[in-house]
Amino acid sequence: MNCKFFTIACALLSMSFCSWANENKTDSVGYQFTVTKELKTNPVKDQSRSGTCWSFSTLSFIEDDLLRQGKPAVDLSEMFIVRNDYIEKAIKYVRMHGDIAFSAGGSAYDELYIIDKYGIVPEEVYTGLNYGTDKHQHGELDAILKGYVD
């Protein structure tokens, strides 16, 4: 009986400490950020379900670097890069008899290589949305391409 009473008393005591630790502390001023330098940037884009974060992130970096250099804002086509990169990956995969990976992933170097070889176009020229969808969904495309090169 004493053991149960002691256990319950300890549990209640520890719960009271937890509620005290979570007590709302209001600060009348709060923390204020001071902006020392504000840089222009392009809006964030949605890759949706495409497995092409490498393309979106690298082109975002390039677009923002162009802004930093004082050039006008431009919206470059991520899917133009992806399309040409898939062609290059397929050629290399077949040449190596399937001994290398063939998947949706990529790297920043892929982006620079494709721009050097094929160039780059604005988003309005090549959106990559040719099938009535408003977001990129590459699950089926990835499976078809893998089946094609195998």
PLM region descriptions:
Residues 1-24:
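Bacterial Sec-dependent N-terminal signal peptides
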Residues 24-150:
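Catalytic-core signature of thiol
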